[in-house]
């Protein structure tokens, strides 16, 4: 009687561990890696991200360091409009410190908040206030928006990877 109870208890523990591992595996992010200028898909959107230089801001927004600007070409591969936001992007320095973009009205191409139509391509820019050094390693991270409900995360080597 005690042996049967022990076997049932051990079996229940094994089943619960198997279920927990299944759900853990289902909700792990899927990392995709690319070089600057190469296409990368995050959720329903294919991106091409390139380094677009540096700038000193404008009269309204002056950086603490310098603005590093990236050019983002995005194509919506789904059948529905999808939201695009500058907050999806972050720059990562060689110490793995994530830095969010700085929003401003620097040009007509600035990505603030936009809905990308199905099978359409658009190009935007965004910038990051960082202590930029061209000899250091810089990466761009791309997260999907909440509406895109994807576990994909894109990592793009911007410089010196």
Predicted regions and their residues:
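Surface-exposed edge beta-strand/loop patches
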Residues: 2-23, 89-90, 116-161
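Sec-dependent signal peptide cleavage junction
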Residues: 20-34
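Short edge beta-strand/loop segments characteristic of extracellular beta-sandwich folds
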Residues: 71-75, 127
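The feature marks short-to-medium sequence segments in extracytoplasmic or secretory-pathway proteins
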Residues: 62, 75-122, 152, 158
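Short, solvent-exposed loop/turn segments enriched in Ser/Thr/Gly
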Residues: 64-70, 122-123
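Low-complexity, acidic Ser/Thr/Pro/Gly-rich terminal tails and inter-domain linkers that flank the onset
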Residues: 30-64
